[in-house]
Structures are given as structure tokens and as C-alpha cells.
């Protein structure tokens, strides 16, 4: 099976996900030789959508490369952590904990949970210069591989490989790290799913543009200011920064919704073996600490 995946990965292109979507929903736009009929595709759109030629996009070194990484299938395997899972408190757990590279972990999750996840929260590297972030996704591509797969020249291919090999912490490296992970997270979300992403001043502007690219600017919900240090950080220049941010995007803003008015008073909560909770709109909502356990897996 792994050999088949490796063979299929050899043929993956940066726009493979988009091509798959077009083939699924617009099969009549593909000719017998596999070429895409843009004129026929335009016929589907002309009376149903306003078209603009004044858009803008985020560009960075390695963008097509990171899109290709999102399309590659993982060549790792999941190995259950039997010692952890056999503990009495974990035997009947319904949760899953995967330990390993998060890019591979997301791809494994997609095999079972694509389009099923209601809510995702991630706390990525902030790329502050002191948080230890360096780009470390390792793939055995050559300059010739990237020239062929990405349709770029040798100079740009070499720059991408140099960036990936030296463990860069540049803005481009951070964006290249984040792009495939956000794309895979989007694929996990249900049609009414939402994602929350913590970040600070160092990359919040880039993250906003990146999320607009992945989720669509129309699916932006909010950028929350989150106070995390009321006194302010001592190493701040000019102004003592006391807060970070939480970006919120939906898979589809038209159908996304939030449960309103979760009570905070203890008198409005119920306590059981799993922790404090309230019932709101017919749904159980956990509040505060809880005692849910996890099943642990490690992938190789």
C-alpha cells in the first residue's frame, strides 16, 4: 500500500486538489484528452456569479511547493500505543491522540474524518524569533523534480530547496509551513465547521491573508484580541504588548453558527463525572475543566 502511495505521489501537481474538485463537479468541462475547456466552464458561471478582474492574492516563495505538499498522501503508518491504550482509564475512550509530525497526522485524520469536524483550534508557532520555529518539512526533491512539478526555473527551485534545507525562520518559510496545514484543516471541517487560530503581532497580518487564500475572505468571522499578559511584556519596544489574537474562519459562513450565551455562573451549570456543563439549544456544552481521556497513537 505504501508503495502505491509513493507511486501516486510521483504524479501529484500543486493544483491537484483543485483539479479533483473540477473533475467531480464539472466533468463535462474535461475533454477526452484530459484538457480543460475554459469556454464551457465559463458558460456555467456567466449568469450565476459576478466576475472581477481586480482581485489580489498573497504571494511568497514556495507557495506552489506548499500547495503540492498538501496534495501528497502521507507515506507514514499509524502504530497504536498499546501500553497507553490499555490503561484502565483509557480502555473505553472514544478520543484519538496522534503523536508525530502534524502534517502527516492531518493526512491520517482526513482518511476517517474528512468533512466531519465541527471545530478546530490550533496554536501554531508564532515565529517571534525566539520561539524555536524553523522550517523542517523534509522531502527528497531535487531541483529537477521541482522544475518539472512546479513549472518554475532552476533558480527558483534552488531557492526553495535552500530555504527548506537550512531550517529558515523567514516569513516565507513560516507561510510555507502553514499553508498545507491550513488546507488540510479546511478539508477536515464540516460545511458548518469553524477554525480558531492563535497568533501574535509577528505573523497576524500574513496569517489573515493566508486564511483569506485558503478559506476565502468571505468566510472570515472575526479577529479577537486576547489579553494574555495584563502587565505587558518587558521586552516590548515602545508599547508594552499585553495581548495576542485569535483568528476565526468558517468553512461556509452562510451555514456556520455559534451557540449563544453560555452561562458562567456555577449556579447555571451541572456537574457530572466529566466536569461542568450546561445544556444550550438542546446541546451539551462543556464549561471549564473536564475529565475526558484520550486514546494515543504514534505514527512512523
Regions found by a protein language model. Give the residues of each.
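DnaQ-like (DEDDh/DEDDy) 3′-5′ exonuclease domain used for proofreading
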Residues: 1-121, 126-180
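Short, surface-exposed basic-aromatic patches at helix termini and helix-loop junctions that form
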Residues: 111-114, 209-217, 240-241
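Conserved S-adenosyl-L-methionine
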Residues: 219-230
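Flexible, glycine-/basic-rich loop-and-beta segments that form/coincide
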Residues: 232-287
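Conserved nucleotide-binding/hydrolysis micro-motifs of P-loop NTPases
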Residues: 125-128, 202-204, 228-231, 253-255
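Conserved small/polar residues in nucleotide/adenosyl-binding loops
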Residues: 298-299
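A short acidic (Asp/Glu
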Residues: 108-109, 131-132, 205-210, 234-237
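Conserved Class I SAM-dependent methyltransferase catalytic core
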Residues: 163-221
Amino acid at each position: 500500500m505504501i508503495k502505491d502511495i509513493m507511486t501516486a505521489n510521483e504524479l501529484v501537481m500543486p493544483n491537484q486538489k483543485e483539479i479533483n474538485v473540477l473533475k467531480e463537479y464539472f466533468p463535462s468541462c474535461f475533454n477526452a484528452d484530459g484538457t480543460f475547456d475554459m469556454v464551457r466552464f465559463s458558460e456555467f458561471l456567466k449568469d450565476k456569479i459576478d466576475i472581477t478582474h481586480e482581485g489580489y492574492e498573497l504571494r511568497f516563495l514556495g507557495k506552489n511547493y506548499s500547495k503540492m505538499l498538501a496534495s501528497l498522501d502521507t507515506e507514514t503508518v499509524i502504530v497504536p500505543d498499546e501500553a497507553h491504550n490499555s490503561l484502565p482509564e483509557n480502555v473505553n475512550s472514544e478520543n484519538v491522540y496522534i503523536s508525530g509530525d502534524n502534517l502527516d497526522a492531518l493526512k491520517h485524520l482526513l482518511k476517517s474524518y474528512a468533512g466531519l469536524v465541527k471545530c478546530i483550534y490550533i496554536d501554531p508557532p508564532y515565529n517571534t524569533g525566539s520561539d524555536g520555529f524553523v522550517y523542517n518539512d523534509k522531502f527528497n526533491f531535487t531541483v529537477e523534480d521541482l522544475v518539472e512539478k512546479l513549472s518554475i526555473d532552476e533558480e527558483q527551485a534552488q531557492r526553495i530547496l535552500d530555504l527548506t534545507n537550512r531550517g529558515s525562520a523567514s516569513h516565507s518559510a513560516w507561510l510555507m509551513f502553514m499553508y498545507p496545514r491550513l488546507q488540510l484543516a479546511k478539508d477536515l471541517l464540516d460545511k458548518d465547521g469553524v477554525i480558531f487560530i492563535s497568533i501574535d503581532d509577528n505573523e497576524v497580518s500574513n496569517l489573515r491573508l493566508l486564511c483569506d487564500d485558503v478559506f476565502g475572505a468571505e468566510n472570515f468571522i472575526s479577529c479577537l484580541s486576547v489579553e494574555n499578559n495584563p502587565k505587558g511584556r518587558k521586552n516590548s519596544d515602545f508599547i508594552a504588548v499585553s495581548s495576542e489574537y485569535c483568528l476565526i474562519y468558517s468553512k461556509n459562513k452562510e451555514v456556520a453558527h455559534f451557540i449563544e450565551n453560555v452561562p458562567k455562573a456555577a449556579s447555571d451549570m451541572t456537574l457530572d463525572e466529566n466536569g461542568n456543563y450546561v445544556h444550550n439549544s438542546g446541546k451539551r456544552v462543556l464549561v471549564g475543566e473536564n475529565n475526558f481521556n484520550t486514546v494515543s497513537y504514534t505514527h512512523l
